[in-house]
Amino acid sequence: VVKVQTVAVAIASTLASSIPALAQNSELAGVREEMKQLQRNYEERMQALEKRLTEAETRAAKAEKSAGQAEQSANKAEKSATQAEETAVAAGRRTGENAFNPAISLIMQGTWARTSQDPNNFFISGFMPSGGEVGPPKRSFGLGETELSISANIDPYFRGIVIASLSPENTVAVEEAYFQTLALAQGFTLKGGRFLSGIGYQNEIHQHAWDFQDAPLPYKAFLGGRYVQDGVQLRWVAPTPFFLEVGGELASGASFPGNDLNKNGAGSTALFAHVGGDIGESYAWRTGLSYLRTSANNRSFQDPNSLGIPVTNSFTGRAKVWVVDGVLKWAPNGNSTQQNVKLQAEYFRSEQDGTLTYDDLASAAPVFGGLTDSFSSRQSGWYAQAVYQFMPRWRMGYRYDALRYGSVNNAIVNNGLGPSAADFSLLGPYNPSRNTAMIDFSPSEFSRLRLQIAQDKSRMGATDNQVFIQYIHSLGPHGAHRF
């Protein structure tokens, strides 16, 4: 028993002494493993740092190279800027030298015409002749009106425009020659000289910019084709979100339905107002009301009597003209280059009150001599037209014109002074009308070719079937046309 106990004690002592040693060995192994892990992490971090350093050095080299290129580009840019500045200064000097030199442009026109009635015998039945150039162009090939325009700023306060008309008969006429203010405040503009009146819509548009070759019948009958003023005009454009314009004119009144009165003061007065705006992105409109008051003194015209002998008649008195105009334009989303439509119409009312003189003393066979009595007329007319650009550069259009004879009181006839209504053949009751169609092609904004056909019933009992081929060419700078 004692031996067994001794052996047990010895075994226990041995186990007790070996347990700490095992524990110490396990701890050392853990420490060694941690050190190895730290070493691996350190090596990985060093590798990462070395990689970042290499990348940074590479980027720095690239940046240095780019900086050199940028410096070279900057030097080139600076040199170019210096050259541009020198060029701009030189151009500025040239601009300053030419700032007040005029811009010159030329409009050339010509026609080929075929008519069933003689254009030399054109008149409008039922209405006093205006004496203006209202008839069709000459038959066959013919030169149209050539327009020479000169314009420039006079100084910071005024602009000057001169437009000369060169006729096919080799005569020169001043169509417009006026100054216009540039610096009046509050939306005012003053114009003085000879100018196209602001009444109506088409009156201010030059002939080469018309949508048809000739003027509508109401313009021919009541304004002699278009109304020109020698005087002054004041316009005011209101500061409103829509277009609102009011204007007035004082002038000599030498144009039909007036004539040269050879007196001091104004011979004619014109007032007009226009309002317009946009409807969405695709529509624009304008409408207006105009009034013209003028006087005539022995405004003469030739009228064949009942024997077909020309007799000189003359009117003295007052003339008034009212005009109502309207325009509607359509262009998809405001872009008119592909397609667009323009609707245009005007209504005219004319009143004349005064005296009419019938004088056949200068005729080959005088019958009644010189007779004078009262005369008055109330007449009207209108036209409507539509022009459609159906594809770029191509347009087609249609216009209808009509005049209404209304009421005419010729006291020479009514009071039985001798001449009968047949002795005033041009003033007999008649309602003229006309149908016109056209198609035109514009290779560019500087040229246009047009084919126009019309059935003109201006002359009583004589329908004039017309075919016109027209060319229009613009040379030099030309300003934008009116709305």
Task: Show which residues each predicted segment covers.
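Gram-negative bacterial Sec-dependent N-terminal signal peptides
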Residues: V2-L22
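Hydrophobic alpha-helical segments, especially transmembrane helices
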Residues: V4-T6, E33, M46, F195, ...
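N-terminal periplasmic/intermembrane-space "pro-region" immediately following the signal or transit peptide
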Residues: I11-S13, L22-I124, M128-G131, F243, ...
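A broad helix-preferring feature
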Residues: E27, E50, E57, E64, ...
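Hydrophobic transmembrane-helix microenvironments that flank and shape a buried ionizable site
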Residues: V31, V172-A173, W322, L343
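Outer membrane beta-barrel
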Residues: A91-F256, K263-S282, L289-Y291, R378-S380, ...
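Outer-membrane beta-barrel pore domains
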Residues: G135, Y178, N203, D211, ...
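A short secondary-structure junction signal
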Residues: V246-G247, P257-N262, R299-Q302, T357
